[in-house]
Amino acid sequence: MTFERSGTRHDLAARHARVVRTLRLAPSVVRVTLAGAELADLPAGGPEDHMKVFFPDPATGELHAPRMVEGALQRPTSGVSVSRDYTPRAVRPTADGAELDLELVLHGMDDGAAAAPAASWAAAASEGDELVVAGPRGSRGVPAGIERLVLVADETAMPAAARWIEQAPHDVEVTVILDLADEEVDAYVDAPAPDGGPSPFERASVERLYRIDGPGQVEEAVRSLDLSGETTYVWAAGEATSLIPVRRYLRHELGLAHEQVKVDGYWKRGVTNRDHHEPLDPSDPD
């Protein structure tokens, strides 16, 4: 079966916003809410939309923001321009613009602010702090015609996984495999949605795995699922290297069609600011 995914292209814009509140969802996860007039037309229609978030230089605290030149982002030629890609967790209109929720994982901080500028900023973020967000460039909807949705995600992919659940039709069966650092992250899974409603994961059948228990658990959990149905769609995202065997199993052993599977390496251990558009497995690109 071929799934249709609606797609929309957006005009790229760099938007300034300021922190209005923060909420620690778990010891290692913080929700940062930004607001501003420039967010009023921010598009965020798809479950896995992503935008570039520009942070202050960790050495100086100065924000070296990009500017738009002929429809393209141009970073400043002087100063350090720091950016990372994030999925917008939620966007809400306000009387004078909009609010944007971002959920940031505080990992890599043991090596200092220079090694983890986004996490270090998020850990200390306070009301009035300024950021610049650019994008998303496009949005793709939930595939039409699916009857079962299987999601595999670590902490970095949970905002997108939550959006998948929220946007999937109510008659779609949702199965989730979560690859979590440890049991402290359970608080993030169970946290209320940004609008104050229940956690979207309450709707799904959720298996929680903990990396402290050893490697290989995600692949084993995926192999235990019955994925034979033609109306099943599988989306997986997280640390790139750990997802390579998952993708190989889904695409080659099971033989699921390209249109039925998406596996996205949001980050890669030992690599700074990995471009998630790069092939997950360079030896076997789609």
Task: Outline where the language-model segments fall.
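Extended, composition-driven regions rather than compact fold-specific motifs
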Residues: 1-286
